């Protein structure tokens, strides 16, 4: 079964996120558990935690259908020790918030070497950052998102994702989230079913589908291989509809949150309905 949704706002309280997801016909959702552009946040109160859990139950969202995202400020591969510690502390806080909320996944961007350390050293720092957080939490999987490779961001090649996983001690609590826009911008073609087959065969060989814990379904304004991260609505960008139809009809993408981060929230309900319809089309074929 496919879990399909979008990254919804938690404005006004975390308990509003499940309601907003239900309003657009979603069977999955992503959210920030705190302001994504600030380092610090007030601790979660028992009331906030209870309200969120009650709302998830009310709208039938289990932890497997929810993909929280961490702060954009965090860089787990930071070349400067003091800044690295700040990121590690913030990441641990994000993991602990998920733990408190009963969530089992935390999606994050791996990090950037900022042109100051070697790529291999940065990847090792990211893996060690994950190890530090996993050692102090329970039940939450660290889900590494592939990047477009913009600037000095790492995680744009499957080999880089595999290298990070290789450095994580508890393999049962690390996974990846594949963003289709990022993959396309990084040079992984998705424009035809044949291209999708090839790209995901490569993913399966290098990373492994056992580590796939979520996806971001985004078309791309950016050109193929451009290393530029610019999302678009489904079918309106340079990837086109075929990739998303193909994903909906492949059982390897069952049971994980498939999250829209497309540019027009006003049509998320339509995009979710279209994605669901592709599943039905396959079932009837």
UniProtKB/Swiss-Prot annotation:
Keyword presence, Zinc: yes
Binding-site list for Zn(2+) 1: 69, 109, 145
Binding residues annotated for Zn(2+) 2, in chain numbering: 145, 179, 216, 261
Biological processes annotated in GO: base-excision repair
Entry annotated with the keyword rRNA-binding: no
Binding site for Zn(2+) 3: 182, 229, 231
Recorded GO MF terms: deoxyribonuclease IV (phage-T4-induced) activity; DNA binding; DNA-(apurinic or apyrimidinic site) endonuclease activity; phosphoric diester hydrolase activity; zinc ion binding
Keywords from the UniProt entry: DNA damage, DNA repair, Endonuclease, Hydrolase, Metal-binding, Nuclease, Zinc
Transmembrane segments: none
SMART domains for this protein: AP2Ec
Cofactor note: Binds 3 Zn(2+) ions.
Enzyme Commission number: 3.1.21.2
Names of required cofactors: Zn(2+)
UniProt-listed PANTHER family: APURINIC-APYRIMIDINIC ENDONUCLEASE, ENDONUCLEASE IV ENDODEOXYRIBONUCLEASE IV
NCBIfam families found in the cross-reference section: nfo, PRK01060.1-4
Function field: Endonuclease IV plays a role in DNA repair. It cleaves phosphodiester bonds at apurinic or apyrimidinic (AP) sites, generating a 3'-hydroxyl group and a 5'-terminal sugar phosphate.
Family, similarity comment: Belongs to the AP endonuclease 2 family.
Protein name: Probable endonuclease 4
Originating organism: Salmonella typhi
């Amino acid at each position: 079964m496919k879990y399909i949704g979008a990254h919804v706002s938690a404005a006004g309280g975390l308990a509003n996120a499940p309601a907003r997801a239900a309003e657009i016909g979603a069977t999955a959702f992503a959210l920030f558990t705190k302001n994504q552009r600030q380092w610090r946040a007030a601790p979660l109160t028992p009331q906030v935690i209870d309200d969120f859990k009650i709302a998830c139950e009310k709208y039938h969202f289990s932890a497997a259908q929810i993909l929280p995202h961490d702060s954009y400020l965090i860089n787990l591969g930071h070349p400067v020790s003091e800044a690295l510690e700040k990121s590690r502390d913030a990441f641990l806080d994000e993991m602990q918030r998920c733990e408190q909320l009963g969530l089992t996944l935390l999606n994050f961007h791996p990090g950037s070497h900022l042109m100051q350390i070697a790529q291999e050293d940065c990847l090792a720092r990211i893996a060690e950052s994950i190890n530090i957080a996993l050692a102090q939490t329970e039940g939450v999987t660290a889900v590494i998102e592939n990047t477009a490779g913009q600037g000095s961001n790492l995680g744009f090649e499957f080999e880089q994702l595999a290298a990070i996983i290789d450095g994580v001690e508890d393999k049962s609590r690390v996974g990846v989230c594949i963003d289709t826009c990022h993959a396309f911008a990084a040079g992984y073609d998705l424009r035809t079913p044949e291209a999708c087959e090839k790209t995901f065969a490569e993913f399966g060989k290098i990373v492994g589908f056992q580590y796939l814990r979520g996806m971001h379904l985004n078309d791309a304004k950016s050109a193929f291989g451009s290393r530029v991260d610019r999302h678009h609505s489904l079918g309106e960008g340079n990837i086109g509809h075929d990739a998303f139809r193909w994903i909906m009809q492949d059982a390897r993408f069952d049971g994980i949150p498939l999250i829209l981060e497309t540019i027009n929230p006003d049509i998320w309900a339509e995009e979710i309905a279209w994605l669901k319809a592709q599943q039905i089309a396959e079932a009837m074929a």
